[in-house]
């Protein structure tokens, strides 16, 4: 007997500016990720229900097509677009459920545009939502629980249109983060517990994705010997992105997963906290496991800012040693920085650019501090009337939405772009990527040229207008 609910849309909204989408959506090995959370929801949906995953960054919402229920999950800067999609689908008779970090922070706002909302994680309540829809008893609010990752199925990769995304694959091995930085909403959404996925499950999924590595053709061996050992892996697309917020939060589990990566013979990159560099045996195992890069949230060069934001693992006077320890093992460093903290002055922009270039970081994102709903910094700034914009489209880390302490909004806007221009200038790329000693230039040079293209949009006054100074 067919399921009474026949067709579902799972929608990942985009920013309502095509140019802003392009700025952060280039199809490169480090960008352009599919909506893995929606692919998990699809895997939890009964097989006799037709599921369509729509990534609005790359395709249009199929308005007018038959659909019973739509789930829309986006970040804060996606919400204006998400609400427009929800409103239109509801006029077509579609029941709409909204979820994600922003909806968790402001569920009543989201209910103005949806029939129901999911607060926190959705996997544990998705079956209830489907049952209630069929019964005609859909609730307004569903409160998600912290699910055990061992109880989850493998995501529906068949729903991804591969031409839209980076050439590798994506996987989740842990969920949550124990640090609780004031600018981050991860703990507000996932809770304070840190959950791990069994290493055996991870091994099986990787083998299902890639299979065992076949014997190498002579031409691949020649490329590996004469150009770079990574090249055959890129040709075979044996590249994995580990999406965890902090891969090493549970060291014993991280070691078990690294042994899996080593056995499966892949190349991979992911996110880790700064204190990774204090564990030399972990660094050695990461190198042996095929790690080509680690994204580290350095955030700031000011220890005062670090302490104020409660990012306690970070010690700014150890940053250079951390980078060198990774570079010595052939692991690239992808740094993330934010500007606009209370200890930042107009000198911070050149300080970050100097640090990135001198320490030869393979990539560096410099973002404007954004008081995202659900974070402690949002609550602090809101209580002190420092937030001057609640136009959610501007909560994209490229727009100033609050009053900085030691500079004007205009100085913050222009300074962030100055940092990008220096880091991704041809001179900056040469010094960081091509000047010896260098790490995996075959991989990072095209990535940097892509970021240079992205920089032109990020620095465009047409795409991100320069704000007026505010009193």
What function would you assign to each model-found segment?
Residues 1-10, 18, 28, 47-53, ...:
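Radical SAM enzyme core and accessory elements
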Residues 2-236:
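Acidic, low-complexity intrinsically disordered segments
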Residues 15-20, 108-109, 252, 304-309, ...:
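Flexible glycine/acidic-rich beta-alpha junction loops that bind and position SAM and/or redox cofactors
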Residues 44, 48, 88, 92, ...:
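Alpha-helical structural signal in soluble globular domains
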Residues 53-57, 73, 188, 272, ...:
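Residue-level recognition of beta-strand->loop/alpha-helix junctions
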Residues 62, 67-72, 76, 255-261, ...:
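Short, electropositive alpha-helical surface patch
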Residues 109-128, 285-295, 351-366:
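Structural recognition of alpha->loop->beta junctions
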Residues 154-334, 341, 347-350, 354:
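Radical SAM [4Fe-4S] cluster-binding motif and immediate context
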């Amino acid at each position: 007997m067919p399921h009474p609910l026949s067709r579902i849309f799972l929608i990942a909204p985009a920013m309502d500016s095509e140019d802003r989408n392009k700025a952060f959506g280039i199809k490169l090995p480090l960008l352009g990720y599919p909506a893995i959370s929606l692919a998990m929801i699809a895997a939890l949906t009964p097989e006799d229900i037709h599921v369509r995953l729509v990534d609005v960054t790359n395709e249009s919402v199929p308005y007018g097509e038959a659909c019973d229920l739509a789930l829309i999950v986006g970040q804060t800067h996606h919400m204006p677009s998400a609400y427009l999609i929800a409103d239109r689908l509801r006029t077509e008779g579609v029941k709409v459920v909204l979820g994600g970090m922003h909806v968790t922070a402001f569920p009543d706002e989201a209910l103005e545009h949806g029939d129901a909302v999911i607060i926190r994680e959705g996997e544990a309540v998705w079956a209830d939502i489907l049952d209630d829809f069929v019964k005609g008893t859909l609730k307004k609010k569903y409160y998600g629980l912290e699910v055990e990752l061992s109880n989850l199925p493998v995501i529906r990769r068949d729903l991804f249109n591969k031409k839209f995304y980076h050439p590798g694959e994506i996987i989740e091995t842990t969920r949550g983060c124990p640090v609780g930085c004031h600018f981050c909403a991860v703990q507000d959404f996932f809770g304070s517990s840190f959950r791990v996925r069994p290493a055996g499950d991870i091994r099986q999924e990787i083998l299902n994705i890639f299979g065992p590595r076949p014997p190498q053709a002579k031409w691949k061996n020649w490329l590996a010997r004469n150009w770079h050992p990574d090249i055959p892996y890129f040709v075979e697309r044996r590249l994995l992105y580990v999406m965890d917020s902090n891969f090493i939060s549970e060291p014993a589990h991280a070691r078990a997963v690294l042994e899996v990566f080593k056995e499966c013979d892949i190349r991979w990159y992911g996110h880790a906290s700064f204190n990774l560099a204090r564990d030399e045996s972990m660094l050695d195992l990461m190198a042996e496991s095929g790690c080509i890069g680690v994204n580290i949230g350095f955030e700031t060069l000011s220890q005062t800012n670090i302490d104020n934001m409660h990012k306690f693992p970070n010690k700014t006077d150890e940053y250079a040693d951390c980078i060198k320890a990774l570079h010595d093992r052939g692991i690239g460093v992808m740094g993330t920085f934010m500007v606009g903290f209370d200890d930042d002055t107009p000198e911070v922009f050149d300080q970050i650019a100097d640090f990135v270039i001198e320490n030869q970081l393979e990539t560096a994102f410099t973002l404007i501090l954004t008081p995202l709903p659900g974070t402690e910094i949002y609550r602090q700034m809101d209580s002190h009337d420092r937030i001057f914009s609640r136009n959610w489209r501007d909560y994209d880390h490229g727009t100033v939405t609050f009053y900085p302490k030691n500079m004007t909004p205009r100085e913050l806007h222009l300074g962030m772009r100055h940092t990008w221009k220096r880091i991704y200038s041809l001179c900056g790329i040469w010094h960081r990527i091509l000047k010896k000693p260098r790490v995996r230039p075959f991989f990072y040079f095209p990535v940097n040229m892509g970021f240079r293209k992205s920089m032109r949009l990020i620095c465009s006054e047409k795409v991100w207008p320069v704000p007026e100074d505010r009193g």
